[in-house]
Swiss-Prot record:
Signal peptide positions on this chain: none
Protein name (database record): Small ribosomal subunit protein uS9
The entry's keywords: Ribonucleoprotein, Ribosomal protein
UniProt-listed PROSITE patterns: RIBOSOMAL_S9
Recorded name of the encoding gene: rpsI
InterPro entries hit by this protein: Ribosomal_Su5_D2-typ_SF, Ribosomal_uS9, Ribosomal_uS9_bac/plastid, Ribosomal_uS9_CS, Ribsml_uS5_D2-typ_fold_subgr
Amino acid sequence: MKEVIDTVGRRKTSVARVFMTPGKGRVIINKLPVEEYFKDEVRRSKALRPLALTERTEEFDIKVNVQGGGITGQSGAVSLGIARALTEFDETVRPILKTEKLLTRDPRMVERKKFGRKKARKRFQFSKR
């Protein structure tokens, strides 16, 4: 078995590199504890959901470098990275994570703005007269 498992998770424009080692359950994101980095409980629970579902919150030390996007995209990227690392460590957790759709890269991206319009789909106000 490898000592360090490293995986990549992506969501929107965020990229998270996850390094997982056997340990005591510490999660460090960009050199900050997860409680400090994701102050919002919703984003924190989203990021750590794979660990909670597989009941392995105390088994691994996880270091994450995450860049790009906002906090929602980053928490999704971290979640995917952790899920991939867990399956690389132990294939038996794959069905659990797969049923919860945690191993699927969310393909949704921001639609580009089109010329002649205010935003991607919104048009300028139309006046008949």
